[in-house]
């Protein structure tokens, strides 16, 4: 397995290399980086251009690129960043930085026996970080999309990421900003929902404001979903694909029916149980 990479004390160097100025928490790096409202003056908020930032958005490339560069700089420095996805708001960090992984668990109050998913930018990247035992067409029919695919992990992943399981959940959100971010970052991102453990998931940045003081950067992509039905807070559908020829539903999530239909089109049979 890949060793953990150093990630402490790099923020100023990385920020300079990305063309960003380094300043105290809450300071503006440009006209688009805004001081967050009280009671969380330590948080920094960066709003994406346009209304929403999902697959249907037509972003202004200048502001879009600025947001990507700012997020990549923080992630490479070992920070935890709040991001919009196609299902919920999430917390992201470098999956190769053990200190950052620990910070995510502390911020959420999450048990370290619960796994973090890995977010990638392209289907081709899945083969680097997983031992894939399903047809490529199946992956492309499900990804990008509101699903987490659980497969056997490869030795490329940090040994401190979910050390209690040989499996890993893979996400490629159907969200333009997240795909661009993962590709620009150039490595696996650990991803989990932006909320305290056991509390409701978040569809806008205000709903996890209690976490802001513990985050380096908050990417505000606007509201996700309609916010009215309980189904919109279910998160991704989590599917175990670690057993050849079978699939197991770990979490029904928001796309159970369509996901199950695709799996069965490829001849996979339902099974029970998973160690992820």
UniProtKB/Swiss-Prot annotation:
Cytoplasmic and mitochondrial threonylcarbamoyl-AMP synthase required for the formation of a threonylcarbamoyl group on adenosine at position 37 (t(6)A37) in tRNAs that read codons beginning with adenine. Catalyzes the conversion of L-threonine, HCO(3)(-)/CO(2) and ATP to give threonylcarbamoyl-AMP (TC-AMP) as the acyladenylate intermediate, with the release of diphosphate. Participates in t(6)A37 formation in cytoplasmic and mitochondrial tRNAs. May regulate the activity of some transporters. It catalyses: L-threonine + hydrogencarbonate + ATP = L-threonylcarbamoyladenylate + diphosphate + H2O. Transmembrane segments: none annotated. It comes from the Eukaryota. It comes from Bos taurus (Bovine). This is Threonylcarbamoyl-AMP synthase. One of its GO terms (biological process) is tRNA threonylcarbamoyladenosine modification. It holds the Pfam family Sua5_yciO_yrdC. One of its GO terms (cellular component) is cytoplasm. PANTHER family: SUA5 (PTHR17490), THREONYLCARBAMOYL-AMP SYNTHASE (PTHR17490:SF10). Residues 22-60 are annotated as: Disordered. It is an enzyme of class 2 (transferase). It is found in: Cytoplasm; Mitochondrion; Cell membrane.
């Amino acid at each position: 397995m890949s060793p953990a990479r150093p990630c402490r004390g790099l923020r100023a160097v990385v920020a300079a290399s990305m063309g960003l100025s380094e300043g105290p928490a809450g300071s503006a790096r440009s006209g688009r980086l805004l001081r967050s409202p009280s009671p969380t003056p330590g948080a920094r908020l960066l709003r994406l251009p346009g209304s929403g930032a999902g697959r249907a958005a037509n972003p202004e490339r200048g502001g879009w690129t600025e947001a990507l560069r700012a997020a990549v700089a923080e992630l490479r420095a070992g920070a935890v960043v709040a991001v919009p996805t196609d299902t919920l708001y999430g917390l992201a960090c470098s999956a190769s930085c053990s200190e950052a992984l620990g910070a995510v668990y502390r911020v959420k109050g999450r048990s370290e026996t619960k796994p973090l998913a890995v977010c990638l930018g392209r289907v081709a990247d899945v083969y680097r970080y997983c031992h894939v035992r399903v047809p490529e067409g199946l992956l492309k029919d499900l990804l990008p999309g509101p699903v987490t695919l659980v497969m056997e992990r490869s030795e490329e992943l940090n040994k401190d990421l979910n050390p209690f399981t040989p499996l890993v959940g893979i996400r490629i959100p159907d969200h333009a900003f997240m795909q661009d971010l993962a590709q620009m970052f150039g490595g696996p991102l650990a991803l989990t929902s932006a909320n305290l453990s056991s509390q409701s998931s978040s569809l806008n940045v205000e709903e996890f404001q209690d976490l802001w003081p513990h985050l380096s950067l908050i990417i505000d992509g606007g509201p996700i979903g309609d916010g009215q039905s309980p189904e919109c807070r279910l998160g991704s559908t989590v599917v175990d694909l670690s057993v050849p020829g079978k699939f197991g539903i770990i979490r029904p999530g928001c796309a159970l029916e369509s996901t199950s239909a695709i799996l069965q089109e490829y001849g996979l049979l339902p099974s029970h149980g998973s160690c992820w």
